[in-house]
Design a protein with these regions (language model features):
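Bacterial Sec-dependent N-terminal signal peptides
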Residues: 1-12
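Surface-exposed, glycine- and small/polar-enriched segments that build interaction surfaces at terminal
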Residues: 10-232
Length: 232
């Protein structure tokens, strides 16, 4: 009995697995400990990892690293790193580092770093330093540094932006680059500029009233708010 349990716990590799709904698959109850080159899941499949191609009607679940391409009608859930092309109808989740292109209809969740292209219909969220292009229909929420372009209705970055934020509301702790939006918020923008109707900068912000007469002798009153780089 001990030998049997031990053999099940050992990770194995197979060229292909076919699953109807776990554990009804060619890898059976040992699917979690088996990595595959090709994986086809009619409804729900569970793997130890994929290095190649995976197609799922509803849900792909991997408990190891994935590289290559993944397609799921609803969700891809990877408890490891992801490298390649990942596409789902609703939700992508990667607990390890992610690189490549990740597309989903609703929500991309990256618990650690994400580099490459992150596109979602509603929300992109990462937990580690990230880079590339982040496009979302509603919000990009990034908990650490980001290098590249963030484009959404709301962009919130809790680290340093080295690049550009474009949206209705943009917020970051430190700006090294450009914010373009209706409302731009930055704790520090010494190395950046904010372009918008309302620019709120906590440290070394530029704030001034200007009164002047134009050529027609009309009085012009202007209030400037933002960063020094925007007005110099």
């Amino acid at each position: 009995m001990l030998v049997s349990i031990s053999s099940l716990a050992q990770e194995s590799k197979r060229p292909i697995q076919i699953s109807f709904a776990y554990p009804l698959s060619t890898n059976g109850i040992n699917a979690k400990n088996t990595s595959n080159t090709l994986s086809y899941n009619i409804i729900y499949g569970k793997n130890g990892g994929v290095r190649g191609f995976e197609l799922g009607g509803v849900l792909n679940e991997n408990h190891g690293n994935v590289s290559g391409a993944q397609y799921a009608g609803v969700s891809n859930m990877t408890y490891g790193s992801s490298n390649g092309l990942v596409l789902s109808g609703v939700y992508n989740m990667i607990t390890g580092n992610a690189s490549g292109m990740h597309f989903t209809g609703v929500y991309n969740q990256f618990n650690k770093k994400a580099s490459g292209i992150q596109i979602s219909g509603v929300l992109n969220m990462t937990g580690g330093n990230s880079s590339g292009l982040a496009f979302s229909g509603v919000a990009n929420l990034y908990r650490s540094d980001y290098k590249g372009l963030q484009f959404s209705v709301v962009n919130i970055n809790n680290g340093t932006i080295n690049g550009m934020q474009m949206g209705v509301v943009n917020k970051t702790k430190k700006l090294k680059g450009l914010q373009i939006g209706i409302v731009n918020i930055a704790d520090n923008a010494d190395d950046g500029a904010c372009l918008g109707l309302i620019n709120l900068v906590k440290k070394n912000r530029y704030s001034a009233f200007e009164v002047s007469f134009n050529e027609s002798a009309f009085l012009d009153v202007t209030y400037k708010l933002g960063t020094h780089k925007l007005y110099t």
